[in-house]
Design a protein with these regions (language model features):
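A generic "binding-loop/recognition-motif" signal
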Residues: 20, 54, 88, 96-97, ...
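Short acidic-glycine-tyrosine-enriched beta hairpin
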Residues: 73-94
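A short, N-terminal "cap"/entry segment at the start of jelly-roll beta-barrel domains
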Residues: 1-34
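Glycine- and acidic-residue-biased ligand/ion/polar-headgroup-sensing regions
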Residues: 54-67, 71-72
Length: 134
């Protein structure tokens, strides 16, 4: 799992442009994103508790806070979590179990994927696990 804030950690080849109208920041440039989904979650909701064998998944919170739990698939250690806030973008590589918990009233986020993950293929690279939320 990697995490960065899109407004604070702008690195080449990504760019940010700011003027009197506001700001535009690149989230991806020249990447192989094959699916994008916008998700809304209510307070107390749990999502995930799964991993992907081939898909790399990126999650960007646009509103609210997410408690993001993760651990490598072949690791018996206890899972860890990070708080993901508005503007944070995190990357989940293949074979990393992940789950999401929503402590605030309302959270919105966008999921970008490299690999099959949407429409009729939504579950084709999703492998469910027991809960990793402690």
């Amino acid at each position: 799992m990697k995490i960065k804030n899109i407004w604070k950690d702008v690195q080449e080849p990504l760019e940010m442009h700011t003027d009197n109208r506001g700001s535009i920041v690149d989230i991806f440039y020249n990447d192989n994103i094959q699916h994008v989904a916008y998700i809304k979650s209510n307070k107390g909701a749990l999502r995930g508790n799964h991993y992907h064998k081939e898909t790399t998944q990126y999650v960007m919170v646009t509103k609210g806070v997410m408690k993001y739990w993760y651990k490598p698939l072949d690791n018996s250690d206890i899972s860890r979590f990070v708080l993901v806030r508005s503007g944070d973008l995190l990357e989940t590589p293949p074979n990393e179990i992940h789950a999401m918990e929503f402590p605030e009233e309302y959270t919105e986020f966008i999921v970008f994927t490299e690999g099959t993950r949407g429409g009729k293929d939504y579950e084709s690279d999703t492998f469910r696990t027991e809960s990793i939320i402690c």
